[in-house]
């Protein structure tokens, strides 16, 4: 059994680690709430643009934006959004597994893939597999700006416009709640039909006068919508990261508390054994006299 002094040193070390994990848990909780606010604020903007796009695309007879035209799919581009930092449980691992499974399914259909990567964890992971990476970005921080994301996104959209790829998807962790984050791979372009499109057809029987013409408006709205979708995915992933880190750090703090209790028990036993030995030596010495 280790000596009492050595055990006491271990207890102090674990207590120091516990303070760090507790602080990280509190920081993650605060950041998660702020990110949730940004997530909630940006969602109505994205949903409204989507509804307007649906209406304008139907009004613009004879014109189909490239982002609305479906074709035979032979190559797909995927924007993968991961974290820059670790200590967030299996968040990135689950996302990478989901993405790789989707890529495998496409490969079985003779569909190849190009990647655009956001987040240092995804960059290091997918580079090791030898994928064709068209663009990458890391170091976004806790308050990402849309201007930083546009570069990687435009790499994919330009490839789509030029016919190098036939569809663009985005993979990220969708924030469900504090205890649940779901890895998803969803289509960006060609723009999939929204569930609300048919509902809008039934509810809106009127038309609008467009300035400028519907074509120019549709071109602008589609770009804004796709940018908002990418921003929303990044913010969703950030909220998921902070939630996962909060849960992981809470578990680490609780485990540290349990370990401290176990070490204190061992320390008390070692101290008791030491006192018993000293008493035995005193009794033996007295008996010898």
From Swiss-Prot:
Keywords: ATP synthesis, Cell inner membrane, Cell membrane, CF(1), Hydrogen ion transport, Ion transport, Membrane, Transport. It is found in: Cell inner membrane. It comes from the Bacteria. Belongs to the ATPase gamma chain family. InterPro entries: ATP_synth_F1_ATPase_gsu, ATP_synth_F1_gsu, ATP_synth_F1_gsu_CS. One of its GO terms (biological process) is proton motive force-driven plasma membrane ATP synthesis. PANTHER family: ATP SYNTHASE GAMMA CHAIN, ATP SYNTHASE SUBUNIT GAMMA, MITOCHONDRIAL. GO terms for cellular component: plasma membrane; proton-transporting ATP synthase complex. One of its GO terms (molecular function) is proton-transporting ATP synthase activity, rotational mechanism. Produces ATP from ADP in the presence of a proton gradient across the membrane. The gamma chain is believed to be important in regulating ATPase activity and the flow of protons through the CF(0) complex. This is ATP synthase gamma chain. It comes from Haemophilus influenzae (strain 86-028NP). F-type ATPases have 2 components, CF(1) - the catalytic core - and CF(0) - the membrane proton channel. CF(1) has five subunits: alpha(3), beta(3), gamma(1), delta(1), epsilon(1). CF(0) has three main subunits: a, b and c.
